[in-house]
Amino acid sequence: MTSSGKVRIYELSKDLGLENKDVLDAAEKLSIAAKSHSSSISDSEAGKIRSLLGKGASPSQPTAPAAKPAPAKPAAGKSILSVKKAPASPGVTAPVAAAKPQAPAQPAASKPLQPSVKAVAPPARPAPAGSTSAGSTPNKPATAPARPTAATTTSTPRPAAAAAPSRPAPSKPQGAPKPQVVGKPSAPELVSKPTPATKPTGAAKPAIVSKPITAAKPAVVAKPAAAKPTIVKPTAPTPRPASSPAAASSAPPPASTPRPAPSRPTPRPAAAPSRPGAPQGQKPQIVSRAGAPPRPGTPPRVGAPTKTGTPARPTPRPELVGKPVPRRTGGVGAPQRPGTGVPQRQGGPARPGAPTRTGKPGAPTRPGGNTLELVGKPIRRDGSSASGRPGAPTRPGAPTRPGMPGGMRKPVAPGELMQLQKPISRPAAPAPRRPDAPNRPTEAAGTATPPVARPTAPSAPRRPGFRPGAPGGQRRPGRPDWDDSAKLEALRSRSPQKQRQKVHIIGENDDALAAQTGGFAGEQQAMVLSASLARPAKPKAQQRTAPKPVAAVRKRRKETARQRQRRRAMELRAAREAKQVRPEMIVVPEDNLTVQELADMLSIESSEIIKSLFFKGVIATVTQTLDMPTIEAVAKEFDVPVLQDDVEEAAKKTVEMIEEADLKHLIRRPPVVTVMGHVDHGKTSLLDAIRQARVAAGEAGGITQHIGAYQVEIQHKDEARKLTFLDTPGHAAFTAMRARGTKVTDVAVLVVAADDGVRPQTLEAISHARAAEVPIVVAINKIDKEGASADRVKQELSEQNLLAEEWGGDVVMVPVSAIKGENIDKLLEMLLLVTEVEDLQANPDRPARGTVIEAHLDKAKGPVATLLIQNGTLKTGDVLAAGPVLGKVRAMVDDNRQRLKEAGPSFAVEALGFSEVPTAGDEFEVYPDEKAARAVVGDRASNARATRLAQQMASRRVSLTAMSGQANEGELKELNLILKADVQGSVEAILGSLEQLPKDEVQVRVLLSAPGEITETDVDLAAASGAVIIGFNTSMASGAKKAADATGVDVRDYDVIYKLLEDIQLAMEGLLEPELIEEALGEAEVRAVFTIGKSAVAGCYVNTGKLHRNCRVRVHRGKQVVYTGDLDSLRRNKDDVKEVATGFECGVGADRFANWEEGDRIEAFKMVTQRRKLTT
């Protein structure tokens, strides 16, 4: 014993008088970790080994005699086993050969002894009565290996057991284990009744039968046949009269001939354990502890022999001590030993097709044979006996299982043994009966259907089907064997035999099968797999359904995360390639696109755009926002034209003002005419001529900067007709205004100056009119000026698909002179003719709907909006909602400043009473009450906030084309502005113009932009942020001027947009650092070199300009510059001078340069600072 209180294996072997390997075998069966004779084990583990080896010795002897009858057969195959232990019991001689296998069986027996410790199914236990009495202890069943058929059944089920026997226990005669049986009083019974030898739990063990192993069934088939021989001896005592006659008749033939296993030969080489006897030891894992309550849902085994001593207590279904294994009934047709009256597990239904053993009175047959659980290794049941009669039991009392050849069995191949180790628990629900299985339990004994021929078991990965047993045998359980709940139950009830479970090698060769057992721990998975592999193939009918789930699992399992990523990448690539078609044109919304959005629009990879920008000197990311020039440059590289969305989208009519309910009340309404064209082409002058007013003369700078709405009444065919004119700005900054004017118009008048022709804003106006789908009437203005050519204008317009009527087109073109009033009447007549064709109608009897043309904040009136009513009638006091702004009309005035009480369709009015300045371009609608209007406004307000936030983010974006090195280094300067204008349209125009200013080194940030006067709050904000306040056509509120003076805030007021933009650009340039530039002074030529001490002086002649002392010089020698630095001394006739002019000679010296040579050219210059300009 070691100092820590542990015992070494070699010390224990000395105490027991055994060899080291015998003790190691016993430790292995008990799942005790012991690698060599010097390994240490605890006292409790040593006690277990002592009890196992001590008890096993005695039983083996009695078992040997029992085995005597069978020795002949087993001896041949099991000669390997040593007969040493067999002699222990008299009469064992003949069985000795068989005993060798039993030696392995003995280990098996030991495992049963440990069932509590290890879930070792008691292999065939020889002890009948004794076992029975001792059956209460699981250990005894372990000894059961000696027992014949019953024992076999028990041992067979344990696949793990089979693995355990990997190393033969020949050194230890089975006699050792058998002694355990002998120890039990039932030992004598064993001879008389080999089957009873199985411990009561052993009876449960028979459930092992479920495992389809032909060889294994007889006696721990997985175990070497040696164990069987032992069983054979008990078989010798034919005393098993209880068995049905059919069983008796069939018994001998099976012993002589292996059961017909259609799919594979009776001995399954794969299933044969490496060591014959050991398998039985492993089987004990399956052994259920005596007295253990049957597992819920498991039907009692039919025909399983029960210990005589335990009849009172229903034999509990063997619990899966180790790996769960389906229990099998005692061998089919194997009669119960006489005298074993232990009833079958109580409550367990008789297994259909399994004959009840005569010896078991009152044992209910198990109706749900399908629900059998694999307690140990499943054993193949063959319906046919040697005699060919299926269901014929082996010799009465023969321990061998029905259908198994008598005598010693050939050891199962290690590979198959591993497979057998997979435990399978079956759900209580009956599985579908196999076609070959008899429907009734009684049929089993009488008429047995011949077993269905099955193909040979496939390779390890394939789940072998179940081989049918004798007619009386259990039917093959179906998929229910793999029920998760049953497995989990088995895991809970099984004894700690985890080390033993490690034996499964299945994982080495079969990954696919390992995948099938998902949801179980590694060891349990391997066990389950091994059990499934041990089964023979199913009949074809069932095979179709069985593989399906496996295939599905495999399919899912095959795809790894990397494979899935590759597949998705390929799908995305294919999708991109499919839509790799370049668009004919892209429309850029609101001059704002990210790299990724542009890539999607161009149907190219974002990396291509990033690469293109990189070669242009711009570092970009996929989320970088691009400005319009950059978008156009990138799109041009890919040959895709770009169109700004606001050019067309803003001009589209999105809301239909006429509803279905208005159709019965429509009347003719006046047309709305929008006057558009390039700046200074005479739009407002033309309107003045039509209105006979002088509006243009009163406009700042002579240009229109907001929309004007006017109504003109003219005579046409002796009838007064009204026309509503909208005058739009022509400056490039007022694109949004022009778009809004076109959106509400019925006819567009395109004004083109005859002396200027088609200009950029002319083209934009054309695109607006086309987007709004309104007819165009061209007014060729200024025909009275010199150099005017109407035909040239028509030619240029024809290039824009506007062909004059006189040239065969459909566009009305009228030459006019706004100053002289020429052809004005003709133009109006053409407008009325065009609008008559349009059939313009509206319903004046409904609440008004229309569009906000312009809006501003008046310091006296508050928010004021110019509304164009497109349908219905607007009255004073109406509650209306204009976008997210709520208003109640307090007053209305027309273009002549006359107050109105109501205004009909196509009328333009200025309305007062809004809660805030509405947004120009929003539609308005009158609601019956304020509550309904507020509900609508609430929803719109939340949307407006989100839109505003997006716009603010967009205004802060950095243009890629404007990004410079200084900006990357954090030296980008910012000019903060606060913008206040008279109307909303002017604010939009100025913001749009500021976006076009170059931002290489100075970024413009608009902190606040709104219509209205400049307030003290604006001044405070400007003072806090260092901003400049820009006012456009607005004034300052009281107190604002004083606050601005006090805080030193710069407030600028403008009335012409040109001047405003010019000053802002100058302010941006003022933030730039001045740059140093060279200013040339003159040149001189070296004609002589004088050495003075260590330095040298050059005698020079000034050719051009002047030389200044301390100026910068470059010395050129040929094509090279040999020196650049300061000119330190300048002398003339030995006098220091400040400068030498052209045509004079002088001496030049530089402290850092003395290598003068004749012919050198001296270039004199100085560095001066210069104000920097913004570069576009």
UniProtKB/Swiss-Prot annotation:
Short name of any one Pfam family annotated for the protein: EF-G_D2
Top-level taxon: Bacteria
Localization in the cell: Cytoplasm
GO CC terms, sorted: cytosol
Span list, region G3: 727-730
Any GO molecular function: GTP binding
Extent of Pro residues compositional bias: 251-270
Predominant localisation class: cytoplasm
Bias kind Basic and acidic residues: ranges: 478-492
Binding locations of GTP: 677-684, 727-731, 781-784
Database matches in NCBIfam families: IF-2, small_GTP
Function text: One of the essential components for the initiation of protein synthesis. Protects formylmethionyl-tRNA from spontaneous hydrolysis and promotes its binding to the 30S ribosomal subunits. Also involved in the hydrolysis of GTP during the formation of the 70S ribosomal complex.
PANTHER family (UniProt xref): TR-TYPE G DOMAIN-CONTAINING PROTEIN (PTHR43381:SF5), TRANSLATION INITIATION FACTOR IF-2-RELATED (PTHR43381)
UniProt protein name: Translation initiation factor IF-2
Organism annotation: Synechococcus sp. (strain CC9902)
Lineage, opening ranks: Bacteria, Bacillati, Cyanobacteriota, Cyanophyceae, Synechococcales
